Structure formats: structure tokens, C-alpha cells
Amino acid sequence: MELSQLEQRLEVLEGRVAFQEVTIEELNQTVVAHQRDISRLQEQLRLLSDKLREQNTSIIASQSEETPPPHY
């Protein structure tokens, strides 16, 4: 192979590597953003679950809080 052909091939490979580096960085930023979203959604789910659990326990009265039936 001639030197000019090798230089052309090298330039093509360098261009591909540069493109891949940009793509990898963009993908990394996307993954980081998704992880932030997942963490935020997990926290919201935890808060909603806690709130629902609190509401369920407050709806059901304990035996001592129940008024006796009318025939007592």
C-alpha cells in the first residue's frame, strides 16, 4: 500500500473514533439523566406508598374506638 492510501485509511478511522467518542458521551449523559429520573420516581413512589399506608390505617378504627352496636 502506498503512503497516501494508509493516510486516507487512518483519517477514516480517526473520524470514526471521534464520532464514537461523541456518541458515547451523549449516551452517557442520557444514562445519567435516566438514573436521576428513576431515583426521583422511586422517591415519589415511596412517599405515595407511605401516604397510602397511613390512610389505610387511619380509615380502619381499632376495637376500642368502635362504638358498640345499638343492642347493647
Swiss-Prot record:
Coiled coil: none
Database matches in Gene3D superfamilies: 1.20.5.300
The organism's place on the tree of life at top rank: Bacteria
Record-linked Pfam families: SlyX
Entry-linked InterPro entries: SlyX
Family that this chain belongs to: Belongs to the SlyX family.
Name recorded for this polypeptide: Protein SlyX
Organism: Sodalis glossinidius (strain morsitans)
Gene name of the record: slyX
